[in-house]
């Protein structure tokens, strides 16, 4: 589970929709809130109504300062943890069984009668222990969170780097296996297709069974397949192993943002997601720079060996240092430990009550990201914009060598201009970090989460992005007249636009679908990666056939046409979320 509350005096508290005022008052007695004038706000999630208790704007400043401990207090309520489990397992509409019924049960055996009913299960159900429970990820020491973030970011960088480092192997693959360039590029396409497909499986599984198990499995399989590619004897094996390396290794693309949402409240979440976004974009851009040096001095196989060694180190780091962040799974582990220590088998967590068959898992959870993508207009249109931008990133992997190697005659170090892209991304990340303060001010003003306020930075970046594309492509179109530094500087503007569109999109999706953040991000990753897989296939033909300048004009016009997307969501986003079946807050 993740931070699940619009900002109020002490963070919003998720209550079942049938909760009465008296139950709300009981909750107040736990210390989660202690003032009057509470107004309920309804929102929907997975087909059922929920209620959040929010305060007036007067307490909003206090909320910004004290949100870290409030969700722990809210999750100390049995009804809340039980409701959250129903959301994550897709069993919201299934009634709670409150009476013992032995009608269809097998005999106890030994001619024994059926046992009497147990006391209320609420007495045996574990929750978090108030606002300062050290088990709750919001209350973990910052040093611990930083370490976990470092491990998660390295995991994300490993998979992102591997997606594009194969571009440095393409010339050798063409020469050794006697294939044309578009066939060799399939090594990139199949890998990205692999990590387009699997996050829609990994994300729901992480919401059922926790983040760590999914990440460990993914990191281990990813490392193995990198060594398999490096030792492959033929092209078919290379391509098959590249696909499965991407498929198995893609868990970080959906699970890492959800893990960040598990650990950080509204004050810090946006800044933490910025680190993940840098890894997602800097990895594919930095890897050709590194890959060109490796490929020029050794063979293409060492590209895969290097990634495999890096992935192995990340796997060890996850096993040794990563701690489970998924809130319901933490309570499951707490219940297991208490049962072992006390020998009281009745102690349990709400997440253990739901038993799902393979069929249930597929129908209720694994299909959820795809269903969300196509029934949620908010998620669909933001994802289309995000996917187009991500596809541009992989187009640039083809355009840069055409401009700087074929145009300007760079023989070695032809990938160094990529660094301008990275500089632009870092500048944009710093800008969005600054804009996060503006976002928190808007939350204070409304007294709740305002996901649309994340999009103001995207309006600016969306304008800079087509300018950067046109700058880079048209100045790079005349290498004999214009110095190579001019298109290089244009690349910095492209980098600013890439990061400035991707990061607000990701934050917007997470905060709009907070309880189902992993599934929403997986849906986004599915389409985004599909674009990233397809774009390189036609990149060379487009840039060579149309010319760098005219191809850039086409891309720039597409990018300019999408500038209104964040403006539309700024105006209509809140009303769309109110009608949503899955959105968190309205």
Swiss-Prot record:
Its main location: membrane. This is Polyamine transporter 1. It is a multi-pass membrane protein. Changing residue 19 to E: Enhances transport activity. The gene is TPO1. GO terms for biological process: cellular response to oxidative stress; polyamine transmembrane transport; putrescine transport; spermidine transport; spermine transport; transmembrane transport. The modification Phosphoserine is found at residues 19, 72, 76, 91, 342. It is found in: Cell membrane. Cell membrane polyamine/proton antiporter, involved in the detoxification of excess polyamines in the cytoplasm. Catalyzes polyamine uptake at alkaline pH and excretion at acidic pH. Recognizes spermidine, spermine and putrescine, the polyamine analogs methylglyoxal bis(guanylhydrazone) (MGBG) and paraquat, the antimalarial drug quinidine, and cycloheximide. Confers resistance to the non-steroidal anti-inflammatory drug indomethacin. It comes from the Eukaryota. Residues 1-57 are annotated as: Disordered. Present with 1470 molecules/cell in log phase SD medium. Belongs to the major facilitator superfamily. DHA1 family. Polyamines/proton antiporter (TC 2.A.1.2.16) subfamily. The chain crosses the membrane at residues 146-166, 182-202, 213-233, 243-263, 272-292, 302-322, 377-397, 415-435, 455-475, 484-504, 506-526, 529-549, 550-570. The lineage of its organism: Eukaryota, Fungi, Dikarya, Ascomycota, Saccharomycotina.
């Amino acid at each position: 589970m993740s931070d699940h509350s619009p900002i109020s005096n002490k963070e919003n508290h998720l209550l079942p929709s049938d909760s009465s005022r008296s139950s709300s008052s009981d909750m107040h007695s736990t210390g989660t809130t202690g003032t009057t004038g509470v107004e309920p706000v309804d929102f929907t999630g997975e087909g059922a109504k929920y209620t959040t208790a929010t305060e007036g704007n007067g307490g909003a400043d206090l909320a910004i300062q004290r949100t870290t401990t409030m969700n722990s207090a809210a999750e100390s309520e049995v009804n809340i943890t039980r409701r959250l489990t129903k959301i994550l397992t897709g069993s919201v509409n299934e009634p709670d069984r409150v009476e013992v019924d032995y009608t269809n049960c097998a005999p106890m055996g030994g001619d024994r009668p059926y046992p009497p009913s147990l006391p209320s299960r609420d007495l045996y159900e574990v929750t978090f222990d108030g606002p300062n429970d050290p088990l709750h990820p919001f209350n973990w020491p910052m040093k611990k969170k930083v370490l976990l973030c470092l491990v998660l970011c390295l995991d994300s960088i490993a998979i992102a780097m591997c997606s594009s480092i194969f571009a440095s192997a393409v010339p050798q693959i063409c020469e050794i296996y006697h294939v044309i360039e578009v066939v060799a590029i399939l090594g990139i396409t199949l890998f990205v297709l692999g990590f387009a497909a699997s996050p829609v499986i990994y994300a729901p599984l992480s919401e059922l069974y926790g983040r760590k198990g999914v990440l460990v499995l993914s990191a281990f399989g990813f490392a193995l397949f990198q060594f398999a590619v490096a030792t492959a004897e033929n092209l078919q094996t290379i391509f098959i192993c590249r696909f499965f390396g991407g498929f198995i290794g893609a868990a970080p693309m959906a699970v890492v943002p959800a893990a960040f949402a598990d650990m950080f409240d509204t004050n810090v979440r946006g800044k933490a997601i910025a680190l993940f976004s840098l890894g997602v974009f800097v990895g594919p851009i930095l890897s050709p720079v590194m890959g060109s040096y490796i490929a020029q001095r050794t063979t293409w196989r060492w590209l895969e060996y290097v990634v495999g060694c890096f992935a192995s180190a990340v796997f060890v780091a996850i096993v040794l240092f990563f701690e489970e962040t998924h809130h319901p799974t933490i309570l499951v582990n707490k219940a297991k430990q208490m049962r072992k220590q006390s020998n009281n088998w009745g102690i349990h967590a709400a997440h253990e009550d739901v038993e799902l068959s393979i069929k249930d898992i597929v129908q209720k959870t694994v299909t959820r990201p795809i269903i969300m993508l196509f029934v949620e207009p908010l998620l669909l249109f933001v994802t289309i914009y995000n996917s187009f931008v991500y596809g541009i990133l992989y187009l640039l992997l083809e355009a840069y060598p055409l401009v700087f190697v074929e145009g300007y005659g760079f023989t070695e170090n032809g990938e160094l201009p990529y660094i301008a892209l990275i500089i632009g991304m870092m500048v944009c990340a710093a800008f969005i970090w600054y804009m996060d303060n503006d976002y928190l001010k808007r939350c204070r003003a409304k007294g709740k989460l305002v996901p649309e306020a994340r999009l103001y930075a995207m309006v600016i970046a969306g304008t800079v992005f087509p300018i950067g594309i046109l700058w880079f492509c048209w100045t790079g179109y005349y290498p004999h007249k214009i110095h190579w530094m001019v298109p290089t500087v244009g690349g910095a503007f492209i980098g600013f636009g890439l990061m400035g569109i991707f990061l607000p999109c990701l934050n917007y999706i997470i905060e709009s679908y907070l309880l189902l953040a992993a599934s929403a991000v997986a849906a986004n990753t599915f389409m985004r990666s599909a674009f990233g897989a397809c774009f390189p296939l036609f990149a060379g033909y487009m840039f060579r056939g149309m010319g760098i300048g005219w191809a850039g004009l086409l891309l720039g016009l597409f990018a300019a046409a999408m500038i209104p997307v964040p403006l539309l969501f700024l105006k209509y986003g809140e009303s769309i979320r109110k009608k949503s079946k899955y959105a968190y807050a309205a």
